[in-house]
Amino acid sequence: MKLDKYTVGRRYGKALFELAIDSNSAEEIYQELLSLRQIYSEIPGLGNVLSDVRLEPHEKRIIMDKLVSGFDGIVKNFLEVVYSYNRMSELSFMIDEYEHRYNDYKGLLLGSVKTAVPLSDEQLQKLEMNVAKTMDYQTVELKQIVDSSIIGGAIVEANHRVIDGSIRTQLEKMRNQLNR
């Protein structure tokens, strides 16, 4: 059975994170993975090229050697394992999973807040503190998204949860109740 890219990303990311914790190097590995993510964003399609069966193995090896030369230890070995299993096209999902686990480990929750108008720094800080308390995290960082179509209120998305306090949703609920 072929695994989808999300399952592959979760498995490899989890394994790398557990190894990082065991070796007491979670922060260093995280920083190296951020560098790797940057390389992948600067060279779109790099993972697909390294996973392409039409490319000669020695050609891929040249590219791979250049890529791993910037990394040491665990990350270098991890890249070699991922390459040997022909999974370089799923590397960004592995990095995402590692980052999610790393943030959980640090007590940090990343999310977004959608509002009709921009929030002041003070409002955003209060909202982040409330979300941290509600979702039981030490720290929350919310990225602001302005969307006037929600009319008012806020929609917070974090950790696969949505807290919808928008006026638009409240009006839709009222309309549905009146139409019954």
From Swiss-Prot:
Keywords: ATP synthesis, Cell membrane, CF(1), Hydrogen ion transport, Ion transport, Membrane, Transport. This is ATP synthase subunit delta. It comes from Enterococcus hirae (strain ATCC 9790 / DSM 20160 / JCM 8729 / LMG 6399 / NBRC 3181 / NCIMB 6459 / NCDO 1258 / NCTC 12367 / WDCM 00089 / R). F(1)F(0) ATP synthase produces ATP from ADP in the presence of a proton or sodium gradient. F-type ATPases consist of two structural domains, F(1) containing the extramembraneous catalytic core and F(0) containing the membrane proton channel, linked together by a central stalk and a peripheral stalk. During catalysis, ATP synthesis in the catalytic domain of F(1) is coupled via a rotary mechanism of the central stalk subunits to proton translocation. Belongs to the ATPase delta chain family. InterPro entries: ATP_synth_OSCP/delta_N_sf, ATPase_OSCP/d_CS, ATPase_OSCP/dsu. GO terms for cellular component: plasma membrane; proton-transporting ATP synthase complex. Its main location: membrane. It is found in: Cell membrane. F-type ATPases have 2 components, F(1) - the catalytic core - and F(0) - the membrane proton channel. F(1) has five subunits: alpha(3), beta(3), gamma(1), delta(1), epsilon(1). F(0) has three main subunits: a(1), b(2) and c(10-14). The alpha and beta chains form an alternating ring which encloses part of the gamma chain. F(1) is attached to F(0) by a central stalk formed by the gamma and epsilon chains, while a peripheral stalk is formed by the delta and b chains. HAMAP family: ATP_synth_delta_bact. NCBIfam families: ATP_synt_delta. GO terms for molecular function: proton-transporting ATP synthase activity, rotational mechanism. It is a peripheral membrane protein.
